């Protein structure tokens, strides 16, 4: 099924569809056929298209976009091998970037602009992938049932006083795998396992749904506390629906671990594929994402924090106030992803 948006974009609803042109309706390519770049994106078209439109308008480089789930895109790239049309792989969470890199799907690139604009902890040390936006894993809480001062750290959520009061999505999701990995790096394998066990014992229900569902569960009284990515709360804040306004009116968010290592953060990021046929254009696209215009568009649309520290967050995101982020090199989380999955399985986080 194909839909044309008001901006002139064509949406690919299923991953099996062929590549579709993503360009402003008013833009008629007059450049050579090689002036294009093919993107596989794990983020939905609506969350990336405005950035691609601005890139095409500024550079004249046409963007061909295919969207799908991270695992599907990685499998597709592996299957296509040297014959892949993809020049860029864009996805959420450092765990997905690490898996792609470990599978040999990225090539190292040397870009002065990317090195200058993106802090080292948010990019691959070998130049194979680069963070493009930041999200925090925050604690959402019921304002009428939980005192803000009663919340402090991720570790505290394993305390028995939270028994039957916490909701969180499945550990099969990479967001939680990376959170477990951050606990493991901070405290070691044994302590991380005890934390997972305690958290599972405190769950109000079996893990289900996405992060927005966890926030709604807190608002409805099914739980008092949830662990979610910050941008899901941002989407509800930006919504014009009465139902969503009611949710955010009753639910607050807190950045944990401000007294020690800081809040766990993660990224959306991208890299140039190992067999990119339009390498130069691919690098230009990543550089555009890291530019002031690209950062404002991408971070604002997604209610995330810019990875370029010179760019201010959107008013909605800025409204949460400043916070201390964990300074851990995010590449480390990818290394410990397998251990995180093992701990989740061992201690029953389904």
Task: Map each language-model feature to its residues.
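Early extracytoplasmic/lumenal segment of secretory-pathway proteins
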Residues: 33-98, 350
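Short beta-strand->loop
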Residues: 40-43, 107-115, 125-126, 129-130, 141-143, 149, 155, 242-264, ...
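A structural signal for short loop-to-beta-strand junctions that line the ligand-binding cleft
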Residues: 84-89, 107-139, 155, 165-168
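A bilobed periplasmic-binding-protein/Venus flytrap-type ligand-binding module shared by bacterial periplasmic
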Residues: 138-145, 265-278, 297
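Periplasmic-binding protein-like
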Residues: 164-171, 288-311
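Ligand-binding pocket segment of bilobal, Venus flytrap-like solute-binding proteins
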Residues: 171, 175, 182, 187-256
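An extracytoplasmic/periplasmic, membrane-proximal ligand-sensing/linker region
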Residues: 303-350
């Amino acid at each position: 099924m194909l839909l044309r948006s008001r901006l002139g974009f064509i949406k690919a609803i299923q991953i099996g569809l062929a590549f579709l042109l993503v360009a402003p309706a008013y833009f008629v390519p007059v450049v050579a056929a090689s002036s294009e770049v093919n993107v596989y994106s794990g983020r939905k078209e609506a969350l990336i298209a405005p950035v691609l439109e601005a890139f095409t308008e500024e550079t004249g480089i046409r963007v061909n976009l295919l969207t799908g789930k991270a695992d599907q895109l990685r499998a597709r790239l592996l299957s296509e091998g040297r014959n892949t049309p993809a020049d860029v792989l864009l996805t959420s969470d450092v765990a997905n970037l690490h898996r792609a890199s470990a599978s040999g799907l990225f090539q190292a690139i040397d870009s002065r602009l990317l090195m200058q604009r993106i802090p080292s902890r948010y990019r691959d040390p070998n130049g194979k992938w680069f963070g493009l936006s930041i999200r925090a894993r925050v604690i959402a809480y019921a304002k009428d049932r939980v005192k803000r001062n009663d919340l402090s750290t991720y570790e505290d959520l394993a305390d028995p006083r939270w028994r039957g009061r916490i909701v969180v999505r499945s550990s099969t999701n990479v967001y939680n795998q990376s959170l477990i990995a951050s606990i493991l790096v901070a405290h070691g394998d044994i302590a991380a396992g005890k934390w997972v066990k305690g958290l599972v014992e405190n769950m109000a229900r079996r893990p289900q749904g996405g992060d927005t569902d966890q926030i709604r569960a807190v608002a409805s009284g099914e739980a008092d506390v949830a662990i979610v990515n910050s941008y899901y709360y941002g989407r509800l804040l930006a919504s014009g629906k009465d139902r969503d306004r009611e949710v955010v009116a009753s639910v607050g968010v807190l950045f944990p671990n401000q007294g020690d290592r800081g809040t766990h953060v993660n990224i959306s990021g991208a890299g140039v594929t190992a067999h990119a046929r339009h390498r130069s254009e691919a690098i230009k696209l990543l550089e555009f994402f890291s530019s002031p215009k690209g950062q404002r568009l991408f971070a604002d649309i997604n209610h995330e924090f810019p990875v370029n520290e010179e760019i201010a967050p959107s008013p909605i995101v800025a409204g949460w106030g400043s916070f201390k982020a964990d300074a851990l090199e995010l590449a480390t989380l990818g290394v410990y992803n397998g251990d995180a999955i093992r701990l989740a399985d061992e201690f029953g986080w389904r």
